Amino acid sequence: MSFGKLYTYPKAPRSTMVLFVAKYNKLDVEICNAFPIKVYPEKGGVGEEYLSKFHTGKVPALETADGFTVYESNAVAWFLAKQDPNTKLCGSGLKEETTVLRWASFTNYELLPPIMAWIRPIIGRAPSSPEILKTCEEACELTIRAIEKEITGKNYLVGDTLTLADLFVVSGLARGYQYVFTKSWAEKHPVVHEYYMRVRNDKDGIFDSILGSNIIRDEPGGTYPDYDGL
């Protein structure tokens, strides 16, 4: 029996970690396309039926077989992780659980926004100039340094095993690697790059099954048809 329906669109960055958890816990989840009008205006939005269940019209969103609905990536990922009563993805004990939630919020509010602000001029979705691109890159640097300080000398962000903290942060970093985190960028950030590659390549290739092969660009790039929005 299907666990439920997970609504998203291809390569949506805030859905990556949710899809990972579903696969990791071997949940029988039906993936349903939903295209928010903010991201794909040409598709006309998600429709009234969707909005009646998920009032903000955002993805990811989950509807379980018994009719329970939840949206916002932090909540959906947490709910799916907890389907395994012995899960370690949420951390062990209150302090670790709190730290995991902090990293989830950090990804959505501190990591993804500056990455997306850097990507938009690159792909022609915002004005671009050398000064604009430099400012965008510098804004990303502040966030990357914060990750670097936390992960130095450790394999995982929280505790000694993989948690949602790692899944959120690596999912956010993956967006950067798709467009602006080039080989030269990786050379300048060896600690974060090594951490990203280690987690990205862990757990039976689950990330690759969601995002495709991990290719690092020689130069920043990407075009609108490849752009998957926020």
Model-derived features: positions:
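Short, solvent-exposed turn/loop segments enriched in Gly/Ser/Thr/Pro and often Arg
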Residues: 9, 164, 214
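Active-site-flanking alpha-helical
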Residues: 81, 172-173, 210
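Proline-centered flexible-loop/turn and helix-kink motifs
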Residues: 27, 55, 85, 152, ...
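Acidic/histidine-enriched, glycine/proline-rich intrinsically disordered or flexible terminal extensions
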Residues: 213-230
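Short, cationic motifs built from Arg/Lys/His that form the positively charged side of catalytic pockets
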Residues: 16-19, 198, 202
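Exported/periplasmic ABC-transporter solute-binding proteins
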Residues: 204-207, 212-214
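GST-like fold's C-terminal all-alpha helical module
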Residues: 95, 103-201
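GST-like domain detector, emphasizing the conserved glutathione-binding G-site
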Residues: 1-134
